[in-house]
A protein has these predicted regions:
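M14 metallocarboxypeptidase catalytic domain recognition
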Residues: 13-457
Length: 457
């Protein structure tokens, strides 16, 4: 494909790149949910190219004038260049590929490799595997084991399982109401605790970005494991005695259901109040009210990292903020699960400066990634968001750091960012090993917190 790419660069007249830009605004037939022929490409991207990609994201969409909404994407940045990788991974529509390659050439990019030749095939394989497993699975006879924690579920199944857990384990599990989404879905989670007395809290949330399916699946896996192991596994039982565990597996249910039913690669919420005729949704992890709208966020409603009309414009994030503020007196450990790349990220994101408790946070992170490596052999990189990845403002991580929560991490789960990576479409067979290693990492941090903070119950 390298030679074909070179031909694409060189065969177009010099003025052709102007026509390529014009192609951004052409309307096409076809469903927004279909990615047939879309290619995932990789290329080295310096700071100039990275900035160009961000500005181009404003016009990376194709619009339907009659329906007044986005019809499909022309390209989508899956993975940005960061401090630990110099490349970008970008998904490109088949009839926009030549134009995009030409624009890359104008930015000085000469070499492009193809990671996935047809994204729709990966999506179809994923859907087939999920449906096939659902048909074959037999009921186990009890509420805990009946929930299949090695597949991807619709949101209604997840909520029903949480409610059933509370019904069948009333002394251990309680359903907590967090918020309502733009489309009026109830966002719930569970509190898992051995006592009605408030204890230091561990909060795990997931599903902030709709297409990152493995994150809510891992949160559900951890939830099931904790309940099933209570009173049987000594280490997990102790963790339940020492801490209140709050697990909110799906913060963005509207986006998640849209990614399941319409557009598998949708990232944002589904809010409409952003001033755009066409583009819906906000990046829920750019919408928090600390250093909002600074580096690593975007003011364009069509951008995948759109910050929202104002801080906490999204009811999902406003509700989560209020829940963390008013319902949890002693929030000690907070983890937000994402994918992908296998990175364990601490504050700050908005600046390269380090927080006052940087040393303690990094010591805990070191123990967490060490526990993961010992458990599964998986390698996770750790550091601050700005130092390891790239600037990002308006995140939950920075907001809670500003509020004084001691241990705060955003975790990019499996897979690694490699040339043969599944990306957002990681097969469900990886849920269990990812859940096991994450639980070990969280336990390592909880034990560190008990030691360092000298928590007394």
């Amino acid at each position: 494909y390298h030679s074909q790419t070179a031909l694409s660069f060189n065969s177009m007249p010099h003025h052709g790149w102007l026509l390529a830009v014009a192609a951004l605004f052409l309307l096409h037939d076809g469903q927004a949910s279909m990615y047939q022929g879309y290619k995932l490409i990789r290329f080295d991207a310096n700071e100039t190219v990275a900035e160009w990609l961000e500005t181009m994201s404003d016009v990376a969409h194709d619009y339907d004038e009659k329906r007044g909404e986005e019809r499909r994407i022309l390209f989508d940045v899956f993975s940005e260049p960061s401090k630990i990788q110099s490349h970008a991974d970008v998904l490109v529509a088949p009839d926009f590929l030549e134009a995009f390659l030409l624009m890359l050439r104008k930015q000085g990019v000469e070499k492009v490799i193809v990671l996935k030749k047809d994204m729709q095939k990966l999506i179809d394989e994923e859907e087939y595997t999920i449906d096939n497993r659902r048909r074959r699975r037999k009921r186990a006879g009890n509420v805990v084991d009946d929930f299949d924690d090695e597949t991807y579920h619709e949101y209604a199944v997840m909520t029903r399982f949480m409610q059933d857990l509370a019904l069948h384990h009333p002394t251990l599990v309680k359903v907590v109401n967090v918020s309502r989404s733009t489309e009026n879905r109830q966002i719930i989670g569970v509190k898992i605790s051995t006592s009605s007395i408030y204890k230091p809290a561990i909060v795990i949330d997931a599903g902030v970005h709709a297409r990152e399916w493995v994150a809510p699946a891992v949160a559900m896996y951890i939830m099931k494991k904790l309940v099933k192991s209570a009173g049987h596994d000594h280490r997990l039982s102790k963790a339940l005695i020492d801490f209140d565990w709050f697990i909110i597996p799906q913060v963005n249910p509207d986006g998640y259901e849209y990614s399941r039913n319409t557009d598998r690669l949708w990232r944002k919420t589904r809010s409409r109040f952003n001033g755009s005729r066409y583009c819906l949704g906000t990046d829920a992890n750019r919408n928090w009210g600390f250093q909002w709208g600074k580096a690593g966020a975007n003011r364009s409603p069509c951008s995948n990292i759109y910050q929202g009309a104002h801080p906490f414009s999204e009811p999902e994030i406003e509700g989560l903020k209020n829940f963390l503020t008013f319902e949890i007196p002693d929030l000690t450990i907070y983890l937000s699960l994402h994918s992908y790349g296998q990175v364990w990220l601490a504050p700050w994101g908005y600046t390269g400066k380090r927080p006052d408790n940087f040393g303690d946070q990094q010591e805990a992170a070191h123990k967490a990634v060490g526990a993961i490596r010992k458990t599964s052999g998986a390698n996770y990189t750790y550091g601050t968001i700005a130092e390891v990845m790239y600037p990002a403002s308006g995140t939950s991580i920075d907001y809670l750091q500003d509020k004084g929560v001691p241990y705060i991490y955003g975790v990019e789960l499996r897979p690694q960012d490699s040339t043969d990576s599944y990306g957002f479409n990681i097969p469900a067979k990886f849920i269990k090993p990812t859940g096991e290693e994450m639980l070990e990492g969280i336990l390592a941090i909880s034990e560190h917190a008990l030691l360092k903070k000298k928590i007394r119950l």
